[in-house]
Amino acid sequence: MQPAMMMFSSKYWARRGFSLDSAVPEEHQLLGSSTLNKPNSGKNDDKGNKGSSKREAATESGKTAVVFSLKNEVGGLVKALRLFQEKRVNMVHIESRKSRRRSSEVEIFVDCECGKTEFNELIQLLKFQTTIVTLNPPENIWTEEEELEDVPWFPRKISELDKCSHRVLMYGSELDADHPGFKDNVYRQRRKYFVDVAMGYKYGQPIPRVEYTEEETKTWGVVFRELSKLYPTHACREYLKNFPLLTKYCGYREDNVPQLEDVSMFLKERSGFTVRPVAGYLSPRDFLAGLAYRVFHCTQYIRHGSDPLYTPEPDTCHELLGHVPLLADPKFAQFSQEIGLASLGASDEDVQKLATCYFFTIEFGLCKQEGQLRAYGAGLLSSIGELKHALSDKACVKAFDPKTTCLQECLITTFQEAYFVSESFEEAKEKMRDFAKSITRPFSVYFNPYTQSIEILKDTRSIENVVQDLRSDLNTVCDALNKMNQYLGI
C-alpha cells in the first residue's frame, strides 16, 4: 500500500447592482494566522504615530463607482461628465449600455477615484440631470486588503512556493515508532541529510544531485523490477508511452536512482511541470498550491530497505514511478493543475474536498481503455499489492463523481474500500471543473504562464488582460486555419 497525498467578488458586484458568484496575500505568516492581508494596525509612521488601518485611508480617497441613466439625446452625456470634472473626480473607466428599464434611455457605468466628500457632492448634482441606478459610496469602497483579509493565504508567484515546501507536517527526519526505520540510526541520519537538502532548496536553484548508497539503490531496484512486470497489463497507455522516455532521458533503470534535476528538466519540456524537493508530508493546501503552478513537490529519500515493497509515507520510489510518467502527459498535467488552481483561497472544507478528489484520482484513479480497467493513480502504480487488487474482481469500483467521491474516506495503511473510474482524463477534468464552481471564493484566479504568477480576476480591467492573451491565441489559430484553407484547400 502506498501513501498518497471565473468568479468575481460577489461583494464588489452586488454594490453595483449585479449578482455574480465567487483572494489574496502580500505577506504569509508561517506560524499562527493563516489569513491574508491584515491591515497594518501596529506599525508607526514617520512621525511616530500609530499606523491607521487601510480601511480608514480608503475612506478618505479610493475607488468607487456609480451607474446612472440618461435620455438618449445629444449632449446628455457631456453634461453629466462635466460634473465629474467640476468636482475633481477622476474617471478610471466608463461603459455604456442600453437601459433595461426604458428603451429611450442609456445607462452609464463610471469607475472613479475620489474622496467621500467629493463623491457625495457629485451625486447631489447628478440627481438633477440623471437617474441614479446604483452607486458604491466610499465607505463601502472595495479594497483588495479588506475583501481578502479573511481568505487563507496562497502563493501569488512561483517563488513563494518556498514558504509552502518548508512546512512539513510529519516524518522528515523525525520518524514515528511504527516506521520501519525508527530503530535504524544510520537510516535516521540519512533522512536528516535529505531534510537538510530540501529545506535548503530555493526556487530557481538546480536541484542538488544525490549520491545514493548501495543499500538505497538496491531497494529502488527491487521496487523498479517488480513493478515493471505489472505495467504492461495494469498501467494506462499514457503511462506506458512515457515510461520508456524516462528510461532514455532520465536514467530510469534498476541499478540507478534518477536525479530530480534530470526529471524536472524532462517534465518541463513535455508538459510544463517541474519538480522540487520536499522533506516529507505537506498539508493539502500547500501541496495543491504547488500544482497550481505546475510544480510537484517530490521527496528524494528512499524507503527503508527492510521492507522494499512497503512505505508509510511518500518516498522517491512513489514519486518517480507513480507520479512522474503521467505528469509528462499534457492532458494529465492540465487536470492536475486545475485541481491546484481550484484550491487557491478556498475554505478549509473545500480544500479537503479537493484533496479527497485528488486522492481518488491522481493517487488511486482508474480509467477505461479498450474496454479494460487501467490504473493511472500514482498510489496504485507504485504499489505491487494494491495495483493487483484494484484491477481484480475483489475491488469495489465506482464511477468518478466529485460530489460523492469527496465524501469517501481516504485510507493510508490498508487498501482503499472503493476506487473510482473515469472514461478518460478529459472526462475527469470536466467533472472537476463543474465541481470547482461549487467552491465559494470571492474571486477567480488565472495562472499567467509568462510571469509564473497568479492573477486575481476581480474587475473588468483584470479580466481585460486575460482577454488580450486569449485574443492573441485565437489570432494564431485563425491564421493557421486560413493557411490550411489556402494551401490544403480545406
UniProtKB/Swiss-Prot annotation:
InterPro entries documented for this protein: ACT-like_dom_sf, ACT_dom, ArAA_hydroxylase, ArAA_hydroxylase_Fe/CU_BS, ArAA_hydroxylase_sf, Aro-AA_hydroxylase_C_sf, Aromatic-AA_hydroxylase_C, Trp_5_mOase
Organism: Homo sapiens
Biological process according to GO: aromatic amino acid metabolic process; serotonin biosynthetic process
Result when mutating Q468R: In RNA edited version
Composition skew (Polar residues), residue ranges: 31-42
Positions that bind Fe cation: H318, H323, E363
Descriptive protein name: Tryptophan 5-hydroxylase 2
EC number: 1.14.16.4
Cofactor: Fe(2+)
Stretches assigned to the ACT domain: 65-140
GO cellular component: cytosol; neuron projection
Reaction equations catalysed: (6R)-L-erythro-5,6,7,8-tetrahydrobiopterin + L-tryptophan + O2 = 5-hydroxy-L-tryptophan + (4aS,6R)-4a-hydroxy-L-erythro-5,6,7,8-tetrahydrobiopterin
Covalent S-S links between cysteines: none
Gene of this entry: TPH2
Keyword Metal-binding part of the UniProt annotation: yes
Keywords: Disease variant, Iron, Metal-binding, Monooxygenase, Oxidoreductase, Phosphoprotein, Serotonin biosynthesis
